[in-house]
A protein has these predicted regions:
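Bacterial N-terminal signal peptides that target proteins for export
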Residues: 1-7
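Cleavable N-terminal signal peptides
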Residues: 8-9, 19
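Sec/Tat signal peptide C-region and signal peptidase I cleavage site
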Residues: 15-21
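Exposed acidic/polar residues on beta-strands and adjacent loops within beta-sheet cores, strongest
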Residues: 21-174
Length: 174
């Protein structure tokens, strides 16, 4: 009986670590962070605890959005840069993106944009040109969220405009 208990304990210790691993375990600054995140299980604990656990990465939770019943996006500051993860309902990181720097004059956006005056069917993640007081604002860089494939897909910003209401930069892009 003791041998069986010892064997079970050894199996648990050998396999238990991967079961509790999250997307930040084994992550290192200076590596291909999106590639390292994809396919990993998302951390599911309190953000404060995750930030503390991975302090060496400069980890900071920046918020998230529910894209659909099947998919969420979560923004993290990792190693001094912002990354966005697409996480499925099972908690797997399906895609990750290094998000460009954004500011008051180049605000971050998430939502529905227009091309030629018509709403696009996909949710767009973008950096906008906030140098004017116009609404909607033109797009500098953008990705659509392919909900079926759970991927970020680059899209041309040419002729694309997005309303100020979807700006997610803290200062609102004003």
């Amino acid at each position: 009986m003791t041998k069986l208990a010892g064997l079970l304990a050894a199996i648990f210790l050998a396999w238990g670590q991967p079961a509790f691993a999250d997307e930040f375990q084994n992550l290192q600054c200076g590596t291909d962070i999106p590639k390292a995140l994809i396919g990993k299980r998302s951390s599911n604990g309190p953000i404060v605890e995750t930030e503390k656990k991975y302090r060496a990465l400069g980890l900071k939770g920046l918020g998230g959005d529910e894209i659909s019943d099947q998919l969420s996006s979560v923004n993290w500051l990792i190693c001094g840069a912002e990354y966005v993860e697409l996480i499925d309902r099972r908690g797997l990181v399906r895609d990750a993106l290094l998000f460009p720097p954004h500011s008051k004059t180049a605000p971050a956006f998430s939502g529905i944009c227009q091309a030629k005056g018509r709403d696009l069917p996909d949710i767009i993640l973008a950096v906008l040109d906030g140098s004017t007081a116009a609404d909607p604002l033109p797009v500098k860089t953008a990705w659509k969220i392919d909900q079926k494939g759970a991927k970020f897909v680059p899209v041309s910003g040419e002729g694309l405009t997005c309303p100020r209401g979807g700006i997610i930069t803290l200062d609102g892009g004003r």
